[in-house]
């Protein structure tokens, strides 16, 4: 029996175009000025220190760090430091009402229904935990943060690595065969399945003929009875 559901965001709960056409450009446009002004702030200094370690350049100055971050954005690198800094910048955008977190129409209602059935809900995304909370806290459907019991990002590992799902199961404290992972990327689902999880693939756009996972187009098409242990 499924006791907890862990969901991805991009392409799963939310249109990937919101991330790539709204969030990413918003942070990119403001990144350099923001870092020059706030590099000494504690919440900014910490990811910059992590970035120096990632680059193996402990003496890198702010301009070198800015250049590296733009390179990471061009490469779509899943850098934990970059994701943290983007999340800080996005926070002001959400709070100022510049945008709201996109959700597919059925997502909020189905998440609420699952919670009412007694399931625990979690998020696992390559975006920082801060960014995840902002998207759901300032979503099209209002503040959905009370629906979730926890959030995971790349601090637990990369999404295509089996160890990441073992880590999450350990932190949640629920057996792998009672966990369901929702994602649009079959390689991520492969890793979760290898860790003993149940899996379901969201097909929001193009079909994925390479996948070996159950597929649905919407959250309200997911039948938890099909995932009995």
Curated annotation (Swiss-Prot):
Report the co-factor binding details: Binds 1 Mg(2+) ion per subunit.
GO BP: any one term: L-methionine salvage from methylthioadenosine
Q: What is its EC number?
A: 3.1.3.77
Whether Ubl conjugation counts among this entry's keywords is: no
Tell me which Pfam families the record gives. Answer: Hydrolase
Q: In which pathway does it act?
A: Amino-acid biosynthesis; L-methionine biosynthesis via salvage pathway; L-methionine from S-methyl-5-thio-alpha-D-ribose 1-phosphate: step 3/6; Amino-acid biosynthesis; L-methionine biosynthesis via salvage pathway; L-methionine from S-methyl-5-thio-alpha-D-ribose 1-phosphate: step 4/6
The family database entries (InterPro entries) matched by this protein are listed as: Enolase-ppase_E1, HAD-like_sf, HAD-SF_hydro_IA, HAD_sf
| Gene3D superfamilies noted in UniProt | 1.10.720.60, HAD superfamily/HAD-like
**Entry keyword set:** Amino-acid biosynthesis, Hydrolase, Magnesium, Metal-binding, Methionine biosynthesis
MF terms from GO for this chain are: 2,3-diketo-5-methylthiopentyl-1-phosphate enolase activity; 2-hydroxy-3-keto-5-methylthiopentenyl-1-phosphate phosphatase activity; acireductone synthase activity; magnesium ion binding
List, separated by semicolons, the cofactors it needs: Mg(2+)
What HAMAP family is this protein classified in?
Salvage_MtnC
Indicate the family of this protein. Belongs to the HAD-like hydrolase superfamily. MasA/MtnC family.
> What is the annotated role of this protein in its UniProt record?
Bifunctional enzyme that catalyzes the enolization of 2,3-diketo-5-methylthiopentyl-1-phosphate (DK-MTP-1-P) into the intermediate 2-hydroxy-3-keto-5-methylthiopentenyl-1-phosphate (HK-MTPenyl-1-P), which is then dephosphorylated to form the acireductone 1,2-dihydroxy-3-keto-5-methylthiopentene (DHK-MTPene).
Q: How does it assemble?
A: Monomer.
Q: What is this protein called?
A: Enolase-phosphatase E1
What organism is recorded for this protein?
Answer: Serratia proteamaculans (strain 568)
Could you tell me the gene encoding this protein? Answer: mtnC
């Amino acid at each position: 029996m499924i006791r907890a559901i862990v969901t991805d965001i991009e392409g799963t709960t939310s249109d990937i175009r919101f991330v790539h056409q709204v969030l990413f450009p918003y942070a990119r446009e403001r990144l350099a000025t923001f870092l020059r002004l706030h590099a000494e702030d504690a919440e900014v200094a910490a990811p910059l220190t992590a970035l120096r370690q990632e680059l193996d350049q402990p003496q890198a100055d702010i301009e070198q760090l800015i250049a590296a971050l733009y390179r990471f954005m061009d490469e779509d690198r899943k850098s934990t430091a970059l994701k943290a800094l983007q999340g800080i910048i996005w926070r002001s955008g959400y709070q100022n009402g510049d945008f709201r977190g996109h959700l597919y129409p059925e997502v909020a209602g189905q998440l609420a229904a699952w919670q009412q059935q007694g399931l625990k809900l979690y998020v696992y995304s390559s975006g920082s935990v801060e960014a995840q909370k902002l998207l759901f806290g300032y979503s099209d459907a209002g503040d959905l943060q009370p629906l979730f019991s926890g959030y995971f990002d790349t601090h637990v590992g990369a999404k295509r690595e089996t160890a990441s799902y073992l880590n999450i199961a350990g932190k949640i404290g629920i057996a792998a065969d009672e966990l369901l992972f929702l994602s649009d990327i079959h390689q991520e689902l492969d890793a979760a399945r290898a860790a003993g999880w149940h899996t379901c693939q969201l097909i929001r756009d193009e079909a994925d003929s390479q996948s070996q996972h159950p597929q649905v187009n919407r959250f309200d098409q997911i039948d938890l009875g099909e995932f009995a242990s």
